[in-house]
Structures are given as C-alpha cells and as structure tokens.
Amino acid sequence: MKFLTLNTHSWMEEDAEGKFQTLKEQILKAKYDIICFQEVNQEIETSVVDTDAYYHALPSATPIHQDHFVRLLVEKLAEEGLQYHWTWAYNHIGYDHLNEGVAVLSRQPLTASEILVSDVDDPTDYHTRRVAVAETTVDGREVAVASVHLSWWDKGFQEEWARIE
C-alpha cells in the first residue's frame, strides 16, 4: 500500500502554486493508494462550484469553492489520467478568510464519514476539529483511514484523541 499524509497549509505558503505543482508531480509519480491532507483550504469569498461523483460530501461540509485545494488537485490529476475519490471534513474558519479542514483521497471508491472530536462545534472557533474517515479497498483488502489534525498537546489533544479511540 502506498500512503501519503501531508499538512498542506494550502494557499498559505510562499510560492503556493509552485508547491502545488511539485505535489501534483509527486503524486503522479508515486500513484499513492491513499492520501490524507490536513489544513486543506478554500477562500470563504470565492465562488461555489458543482462537484462530480468522485467527491463524497460529509454532513458538516460547506459548499466546495472554485479554489478548494483538493478539488483543484484532483482535477489536475484526472487530466493526467490519475483519478481519486475524495472527501473533506470542514473544521473551522482559518485566518479570518479560509474554510479549513482535512481530506482523504483514495484511488478506489470510498465510504466517507466524520467524527467531531472537539468540545466545540462552531466554524468560527478554531478549536473545532473533525476527523475525515474513509472506508475503501486497497489491493483487495478493506481498510479504514482517517485524516486527523488535532489541537496542541496541552490545548485539547488528549481529549480529542480519546474520542477517536
């Protein structure tokens, strides 16, 4: 099984477009079975777009926007012949202008769910944390994977981790 996890800090880094291209090229080269991303962002004010059947929406999902990091990445990968199913768990507003969350991508169809692990469930509170869970198959074996971005050790991590267990 080829697995990648990465805190993308999407659209917040210097040379974000260059890093996006580097990531796309690495995925095309490695052809990961499963990918988990954290800090997957989209601007709050950009236009909402339609999604295709490869996107598996969760109950907490805010609409997907034109600049959604994973949507764009999956679209570019598909143009190169590499298709991924994906889901995104929306957590909270980041830096006053971003919808931020965690994502799971799978080369095989997936069943998506989420777990609220924080004490709060308020998108305006950066303490809000959800885990994106995907059940899928890899090499004929059923697997469950989770994309997790928990609080700092002394700011809620232990309680959040206990809710996952």
Positions of predicted regions on the chain:
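Beta-strand-turn-beta hairpins that frame and shape the catalytic cleft
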Residues: 1-4, 97-102, 106-112, 126-147
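N-terminal, active-site-proximal structural segment of metallo-dependent hydrolase catalytic domains
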Residues: 1-98, 141, 160-163
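Short, flexible loop segments at the rims of nucleotide/cofactor-binding pockets, characterized by
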Residues: 10-15, 122-124, 154-157
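Alpha-helical scaffolding within the catalytic cores
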Residues: 21-22, 120-121, 128-132
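Conserved residues at the C-terminal ends of beta-strands
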Residues: 38, 43, 106, 116, ...
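Short secondary-structure junctions
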Residues: 82-87, 109-115
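Short, P/G- and charge-enriched loop/turn segments at secondary-structure junctions
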Residues: 89-93, 118-123
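Active-site beta-loop-alpha substructure in enzyme catalytic cores
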Residues: 140-165
